[in-house]
Amino acid sequence: MSQDKKNIKEGFCQIQKREDRKFLIGRTYKDFISYTDDHDNVSIVEMDTVYNGQSGPFMQTFKFLSYSFIFIIYHEEKSAKAMVESVDPLESILGKDLFLKEVKVIKTDRGSEFSDAEGLEKDNDGSMRTYVFYCDSMASCHKGSLENNHKEIRYICPKETNLKVLGFDSQKKANLIVSHINSRPKENLKGKSPLE
């Protein structure tokens, strides 16, 4: 028996759960379902990250479900602080009123980069700007619409390739990627593109 199998059999290899899960209280997928049941026509944005290596670069992806519109923010690091800081320019681009209308809910996964729920939910003056909910563990189907767009991103930036060697090195390149994706006609938009 190999040493690895022996260690597993003897219980040496244990998965360590993240200790602090307080950010999930009131923000689980079950809470998301309850919230959307109680609030008709709520605008939902799905959020995730796409990357090929732990050294980056990283793409923080946002999908506006009402419009099938995707937006990418370029990052050099994948930290909770970086993810929170990217919501500010999104709010700035849309303007406060439009942001409050179109980004009522952000649905994301439980990645450590999204663990600062309060930072994502509140703007710089501490007022609520959105509600964050987390998909169940290992349930990418809970944000399947965005995952489908990730397939389009992977067509441009295949897995296991160095993104910087491909030329993905700036927000300008991220904008070019989403320009291509948002220009494609979508069946759910009756043959129109998200930009139309």
Protein language model regions, located:
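Mobile-element integrase/transposase regions
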Residues: S2-M59
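Charged alpha-helix within mobile-element recombinases
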Residues: K122-D125, R129-E196
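Active-site beta-loop-alpha junctions of metal-dependent nucleic acid enzymes
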Residues: N52-S55, I72-D97
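Short, surface-exposed connector motifs at secondary-structure boundaries
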Residues: Y67-F71, D97-K104, K159-E160
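Coil-to-beta-strand transition motifs
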Residues: S55-P57, L65-I70
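Mobile genetic element proteins and their domesticated derivatives, centered on retroelements
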Residues: D48, F62, S68, V87, ...
